[in-house]
Amino acid sequence: MQFAFDNSFHADMQGFYAPAEAAKPSAPRLLAFNDALAERLGFDRRGVDADELARVFSGEELPEGAAPIALAYAGHQFGHFSPQLGDGRALLLGEIVAPDGARFDIQLKGSGPTAFSRGGDGKAAIGPVLREFLVSEAMAAMGVPTTRALAAVTTGERVERERAHPGAVLTRVASSHIRVGTFQFFAAHFGADHVVQLSDYSIARHFPDLADAANPHLALLDRVIGLQCALIARWLGVGFIHGVMNTDNVAISGETIDYGPCAFMDRFAANTVFSSIDATGRYAYGRQPQIMHWNMARFAEALLPAIHRVSPADVEAAKALVDAIPGRFRAAWHAQVREKLGLSTSAGDDAELIDRLFDELEKHSVDFTTFFRALAMLLRGEGAMMQALLPAPDAMAPWIADWWQRIEQDAANPLDLADAMDAVNPLYIPRNHRVEAALEAAEAGDPAPWLELLEVVRQPFAARAGRERFAEPAPADAAPYTTFCGT
């Protein structure tokens, strides 16, 4: 299989990575390949069979032009600074430039130990690999910025975690793997010269329009803050809980990265947590905006040497950007919710309507995803879906009446609004009980349920006959759902 590698990070950023080599798997076998993404990247699959794909995307066979490296980074993990983390179980094969000119990293995740493994085996189990493949594809289909999955390959080996699991390797595609933690590593260990170099590279790669700004490093901070505000608003809009929002899991590209213990909320509760390692609820659904703010403050701290070098006065400007984050996020969030509610204009009392909505959803323990589809059905004159969803006929009645009044202010066609709402409010998400059942089946050797679920979540908005069960939340008496990071 031919790759047109153009490895700018390897060539331009020496000292920011360590050479790496993939472990050779005993019997690689292709589980899934993302043909649509491969086409987007300009890969030519003609004449390439599943065995060759398995060899390449397990790390057994190095493609021509690859320059495998493991990237260095640090990070705040649950609020505590770890000065050296890095790619402990992943290697960057290289970069390709797609036909449209976009540049992407091609990374193998679970490919064996690196210089940053800190005693770990560098491997991945099949469950976390298939979870990231599935959820990242669902997020992409819902329009949420995200890394993507190109391939999943089993290795023929067992990986020891709490018990032995089949080993696997994920091929991840990202605009880059530059993280907030990347800046933190070089700010902590090497100082201003390296931070300036990393910032200059990041601007050239991701945001070339910032190069002519009065202070490009300050402009980078501003841009990344804007992307993160928009990203977290999108997460909240689909009920997504990342689970481990450490600074090493924040990509400056604004893409969702490192799915680990992620999950989706069923019944709305702002304090929802699924991750087994988040005992204090630091990364709960409703705390994600505050954590984003905290992470961006850490990014600003790491960038300060570069910002100060151009203009010492801009240090105060950086502080002002960080202080303004809550307002910027709230604007992004309100715009997101207005879209979900079918509101085509902005009105002064929208903030109160939105805040009351989430109070009501929590009070009545309403399924978050289904509610917005039921709301659209009201615009079509059909109330059965909403009646079945709410615990009592008059539950949320005052709020719904106020929403109707607000809809009428926009003077739009209700049927057109309903269609617009259905185009942004997913019907099918990776429901946790469905994900778990699919992963258990795949680990037992039956990938069919996982493949079916993948097909469903890749088309999240349009209702399809025979797929009704995928829109249903977990049974009310289901045990609490817990996720694990898989490392």
Curated annotation (Swiss-Prot):
GO terms for molecular function: AMPylase activity; ATP binding; magnesium ion binding. Its cofactor is Mg(2+); Mn(2+). The active site is at D248 (proton acceptor). It is an enzyme of class 2 (transferase). It holds the Pfam family SelO. Mg(2+) binds at N249, D258. Keywords: ATP-binding, Magnesium, Manganese, Metal-binding, Nucleotide-binding, Nucleotidyltransferase, Transferase. It comes from the Bacteria. It catalyses: L-seryl-[protein] + ATP = 3-O-(5'-adenylyl)-L-seryl-[protein] + diphosphate; L-threonyl-[protein] + ATP = 3-O-(5'-adenylyl)-L-threonyl-[protein] + diphosphate; L-tyrosyl-[protein] + ATP = O-(5'-adenylyl)-L-tyrosyl-[protein] + diphosphate; L-histidyl-[protein] + UTP = N(tele)-(5'-uridylyl)-L-histidyl-[protein] + diphosphate. Its EC number is 2.7.7.-, 2.7.7.108. ATP binds at G86, G88, R89, K109, D121, G122, R172, R179, D258. Transmembrane segments: none annotated. Nucleotidyltransferase involved in the post-translational modification of proteins. It can catalyze the addition of adenosine monophosphate (AMP) or uridine monophosphate (UMP) to a protein, resulting in modifications known as AMPylation and UMPylation. HAMAP family: YdiU_SelO. Belongs to the SELO family. This is Protein nucleotidyltransferase YdiU. It comes from Sphingopyxis alaskensis (strain DSM 13593 / LMG 18877 / RB2256). The lineage of its organism: Bacteria, Pseudomonadati, Pseudomonadota, Alphaproteobacteria, Sphingomonadales.
